[in-house]
């Protein structure tokens, strides 16, 4: 368990660091950012799983490797979820409103009917709040850890 929390902590801090640097540079809109995050997640899960295998005299079953990768992703995602909650609640709450407005503009510009845009936005606004977003971070990063492992 300590192994998972250590590597999960490294993963979480790495993702938070990337997010903060991009925020300070004003590059949060860049589309390539998600690919950098995926690469970091994959690399840290790989290195963490290899370290676990090494600590077990070079023997690691498929199930142990899978649980190590998912565990690392889960513990990392908990840190990122906490950061997400703090960021959108206290650091830059206006950014969330900007995202919602941009999403609405994109829907109107794509030719979506007004009624459908309104219905979609009503649903989106319920989930685009710090709490639900943080929960989605945990779910999505843990699932991604499962896929990568």
Each PLM stretch: what is its role?
Residues 5-9, 88, 137-141:
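Polytopic transmembrane helical bundles with strong interfacial aromatic enrichment
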Residues 51-65, 89:
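Membrane-helix interface/capping segments
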Residues 14-22, 44, 76-80, 84, ...:
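Alpha-helical transmembrane segments of multipass membrane proteins
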Residues 2, 6-10, 67-76:
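Alpha-helical transmembrane segments of multi-pass membrane proteins
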Residues 1-52:
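Transmembrane alpha-helical insertion/packing segments
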Residues 123-146:
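Individual transmembrane alpha-helix segments
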Residues 91-129:
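Membrane-interface interhelical loops and short interface/amphipathic helices
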Residues 72-94:
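Hydrophobic alpha-helical membrane-insertion segments
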């Amino acid at each position: 368990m300590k192994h998972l929390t250590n590597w999960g902590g490294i993963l979480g801090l790495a993702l938070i660091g990337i997010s903060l640097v991009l925020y300070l540079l004003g590059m949060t809109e860049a589309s390539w950012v998600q690919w950098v995050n995926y690469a970091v997640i994959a690399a840290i899960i790989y290195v963490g799983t290899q370290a676990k295998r090494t600590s077990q005299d070079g023997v690691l079953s498929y199930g142990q490797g899978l649980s190590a990768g998912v565990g690392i992703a889960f513990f990392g995602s908990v840190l990122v979820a906490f950061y997400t909650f703090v960021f959108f609640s206290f650091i830059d709450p206006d950014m969330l409103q900007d995202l919602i407005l941009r999403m609405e503009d994109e829907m109107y510009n794509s030719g979506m009917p007004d009624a459908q845009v309104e219905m979609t936005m009503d649903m989106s606004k319920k989930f685009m709040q710090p709490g639900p977003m943080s929960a989605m971070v945990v779910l999505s990063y843990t699932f991604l850890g499962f896929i990568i492992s």
